[in-house]
Amino acid sequence: MFDNLTDRLSRTLRNISGRGRLTEDNVKDTLREVRMALLEADVALPVVREFINRVKEKAVGHEVNKSLTPGQEFVKIVRNELVAAMGEENQTLNLAAQPPAVVLMAGLQGAGKTTSVGKLGKFLREKHKKKVLVVSADVYRPAAIKQLETLAEQVGVDFFPSDVGQKPVDIVNAALKEAKLKFYDVLLVDTAGRLHVDEAMMDEIKQVHASINPVETLFVVDAMTGQDAANTAKAFNEALPLTGVVLTKVDGDARGGAALSIRHITGKPIKFLGVGEKTEALEPFHPDRIASRILGMGDVLSLIEDIESKVDRAQAEKLASKLKKGDGFDLNDFLEQLRQMKNMGGMASLMGKLPGMGQIPDNVKSQMDDKVLVRMEAIINSMTMKERAKPEIIKGSRKRRIAAGCGMQVQDVNRLLKQFDDMQRMMKKMKKGGMAKMMRSMKGMMPPGFPGR
């Protein structure tokens, strides 16, 4: 997420953060680099101009905090201004209205509206314990109604049936009546996608909006469209009273222009980020955390939240108990750890939330592919239960059979066993309580180029 911008800004700010004093010249040079990085990230020009002016105003002649060097103070100013550009703090959904709270989703075709409705339904059901009903008012695309029905079943929320022969206003009114009758907390309304902002379609969504009077009107927009996302959101906002934005496909956006432009151009907050195809891949938008990620400082708070919500506690306690008894760490445990990592969004997602990732060379980053986890899982699945429990018995002929069973090479099996040995040693150190030793050994296990290596 935002890799190109993170690389450029991390490199630029690393050059200035070691400076003993800031002069107008080196601030000017650094700001020129920052400006280029933002423009290359497709941030809207008015946003870039205001951002640079605000940083310059605060940096030149700024009194430095005694605990920071002038260079560090400059980085702090840049981070604070990034946060300000994106909206200061997380804006949650307004669900305080008398139930059912109606949330209307609008946006262009292909932005990911229907998927976002499913993700939001899951988020509200699991995180906020809400009883959710979803309905599709997209009568122009029969597949959209079926898609939402399938998604609703997957995420465990209720679906209100609709038909292409009905009028969108009639559909949403019937759904609202049902939601009131059956005491639903939230009604999520999926609307037809527009190819562009045309008058007939905008009139239709205005009528839908007027008939159900939603407490939240969210504009769903594809992050990969860059500053166009902000301009489209502005056009929609002129027709509809938007309350926020859902930025989708953020995991595929290496630039980040949309995230930095939307708040400034529309005046509306980004409320959620779509960070993948899975139904749980929806994150509340925290400007301070995203600013830290953009500057390569990581996002430890989100990482902790991921661990708390996505790691299977029963399995974690089972492993801890096993290690305490001295039963050892085997390949079944290793397989479980790989699955937990996949549940948390995969290797790239985890690494993106760790501090210092902006300093990693591109050739090392390219190896952080989630396909690696899939291959490792396939190799372990090709082993017998005896081999998983006693990895030391895996020698030449067994390695050849395992490799053939999963379509890999023997060197792939060797690589996995080496990684398992490293993990096993680390677990032994944890058992002995040598946390400091373990941290040092983790640094040793990292490829050259990682922070701290």
From Swiss-Prot:
SMART domains: AAA, SRP54, SRP54_N
Gene Ontology CC annotation, any one: ribonucleoprotein complex
EC number(s) per entry: 3.6.5.4
Activity modulation: Conformation of the Ffh-FtsY complex and regulation of its GTPase activity are modulated by the 4.5S RNA. Formation of the FfH-FtsY complex leads to a mutual stimulation of both GTPases.
UniProt KW keywords: Cytoplasm, GTP-binding, Hydrolase, Nucleotide-binding, Ribonucleoprotein, RNA-binding, Signal recognition particle
Phenotype when the gene is knocked out: Essential; deletion experiments lead to loss of inner membrane protein targeting. Also leads to reduced targeting of lipoproteins Lpp and BRP.
PROSITE patterns documented for this protein: SRP54
Any Pfam family: SRP54
SUPFAM superfamilies: P-loop containing nucleoside triphosphate hydrolases, Signal peptide-binding domain
Domain of life: Bacteria
Binding residue positions for GTP: 107-114, 190-194, 248-251
One GO-annotated biological process of the protein: protein targeting to membrane
Localization of this protein: Cytoplasm
Keyword Disulfide bond: no
Main location: cytoplasm
InterPro entries cross-referenced by the UniProt entry: AAA+_ATPase (IPR003593), P-loop_NTPase (IPR027417), Signal_recog_part_SRP54_M_sf (IPR036891), Signal_recog_particl_SRP54_hlx (IPR013822), Signal_recog_particle_SRP54_M (IPR004125), SRP (IPR004780), SRP54 (IPR022941), SRP54_GTPase_dom (IPR000897)
Reaction equations catalysed: GTP + H2O = GDP + phosphate + H(+)
Gene Ontology MF: a single term: GTP binding
Keyword Transcription regulation set for record: no
Family of this protein: Belongs to the GTP-binding SRP family. SRP54 subfamily.
Biological function: Involved in targeting and insertion of nascent membrane proteins into the cytoplasmic membrane. Binds to the hydrophobic signal sequence of the ribosome-nascent chain (RNC) as it emerges from the ribosomes. The SRP-RNC complex is then targeted to the cytoplasmic membrane where it interacts with the SRP receptor FtsY. Interaction with FtsY leads to the transfer of the RNC complex to the Sec translocase for insertion into the membrane, the hydrolysis of GTP by both Ffh and FtsY, and the dissociation of the SRP-FtsY complex into the individual components.
Subunit structure as annotated in this protein's UniProt entry: Part of the signal recognition particle protein translocation system, which is composed of SRP and FtsY. SRP is a ribonucleoprotein composed of Ffh and a 4.5S RNA molecule. Metal ions are essential for the formation and stability of the SRP complex. Interacts with the ribosomes, via ribosomal protein L23. Interacts with FtsY.
Comment field on protein domains: Composed of three domains: the N-terminal N domain, which is responsible for interactions with the ribosome, the central G domain, which binds GTP, and the C-terminal M domain, which binds the RNA and the signal sequence of the RNC.
Protein name per the record: Signal recognition particle protein
Recorded name of the encoding gene: ffh
